[in-house]
Amino acid sequence: MGEFGWICGFSADAGFINQAAERFTTYAAAQRAAAGQIRLALMLDPSQPVLLPTVVPGVAHLPLQDLSRKPFRLLHAKVALLGFRDAATAGQHHLRLVVSTGNWTRQTLEESLDLAWRVDLEVAPDVADDAVSRADMMAAQGLFAWLLDLHDTRLLEADTPLSGRDAADHVDQWIARCNRAPRARPRLLDTRSRSLLDQIIAGLKREGGVARSHLCMGSGFYEAATVRKGGTGTPVLPHKIVKRLKASQALSPRARVDLYVNPQACQAIAGAVDHLRLDADHPIHVRAAAAPAAVFGAGHERTLHAKFLFSSNRSTTTGACNSAWLYLGSGNLTTAGLLNAASQAGGNLEAGILEFPEGLSWKKSADPSRWIENLLPIGGNTLDDLPSLQPGDPWAPPPPQHVAAPIAYLVWRADGRLTRPDPTAGDVEVLDEAGTPCAITADGYTWSGPAPRLVRVRWVAGAEARLAWVPVIDAHGRVAATPLPAIDLDHAWTQLAAFPGLPDEEEGEGEGDPGIFPDDRLTGPKRRTPRNLTPGSAIRQMMMLIEQIAAQQTAVDAVDWTAWCNRLEQALFQARQCPAVTCFVQMQLNPLSPLRAPAFRPDFAEDAGTAAGRHYEQTLRRIELAWETHDYAPLEGRQ
């Protein structure tokens, strides 16, 4: 089960992200929307439209803090760093790092020809002794720490265990265990300070000066033609790569060099096939990328989007890929993608890996997983027919769409107010459903109607009026969550028994979307008409629940205690109008009083002498107030 994860990329869509969130958390969108808990932090290029938490529940799409100071041309790196917990084994954790050449979109899954690389690491309770994988995790954490400093993280830092703050801290602590001897150099590369090509060359030099006889290069996007000294318009970057590799003695003078393209969109390559093939410095053969039949099935066509460099010697007897190395990542074979470090004018933020794989073969062997044409899209034909090649449509970075608002979220109060977490955040209007500014109060705004999941805010930046949606955190700390229905004690226990997970989605739940502005039918407190329930039956039901709660919470880990208290308060709040609670109000008894006994609490929270104990007692007090039993005699004192 996913604890927390960070994702960065150029673009993403709701279809992909919802699938990813469901696989990560194991919960469907409706369950995540009801939980209102942030489990994934998403950072995309600011040119991309915002993915709202009502559309991708459990995911916070973070905006850049200051567009004018972004230290890259494009946020193009495609990396995910994920932390998982084993719900069945305390202290058993798992880290996963994914580096992709594709965007986080349905197009990547269904149409593109892309590559991905991943590494997994167990943390139980100490991290596995894999120095290189530990170094990769630390490198990824450094990249995301740098990105988070540039983004608006106030929502993740909100004072609720459901904001993602505590879960992110847990995963950070797991990754911190990776920082120990022996240490190794990470395979993960990024362009915060150096270009990808510079880092690739440096890595090859450290590995040793072995000249390889084959080089395969592929990219989903190439740059426009540049006029060379001889007057011929031809792309120069492929030859720059070859020249750098030869100069570092990583490529032999007469090596075979193949350049893989999407024939329908290969930019300057489309008009330069002969120039590349006949180049006096080093011939480069242009070939079509091919989707491996072992992966996609025979005859399945996909468009190349992957970016890769693969080089090795080839055994004349076995066909083995000797002295092999592989780069794959987000950096296209362009100046901004491969040659430059990140900068606002000339370099993208890119990420990739440099790997030295063993056991691969140029020949189709008995083990399909070792045949290089099953691993890389390099099985296509040589392209000599210039009319069949197309440059594709030109592309330029779109204008920014996702910008940080002066306020990152609002907090709902029971009296119909939306309060601002930071009263000094500047002049901001909150617009109601009709687009009319809400009345301003001392600490926020007056909202007419039931609690919204999101609200639209308006402010002025310079001379420009801006609009953005911001989430609303409800009284239970849930972020942009769907309304809570009234439940009975059995359903309350179902929610508690599933902790730290979520209860199964019941039939009929999740059909339709209550939307951003739910109506009173969905949000108003509901007092169910009590069925005939005798005091004895109510006491038996309640005592069973109290015993179940005690057994459950005495086994909760200290790191999960705040989240448990939040779940306890939410579930019992939802049950405040059920017949059993109504019966206790009529009997003027407080049924929650036994939960204060030390035997019903874990050791670290058995009394008010600890912060955990005080937090628990405050939670019980709020539940008693919601149940209206706070002034009544304790249940255990009943004669």
Task: Report residues per predicted region.
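Terminal interaction modules at protein C-ends
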Residues: 1-327, 332-639
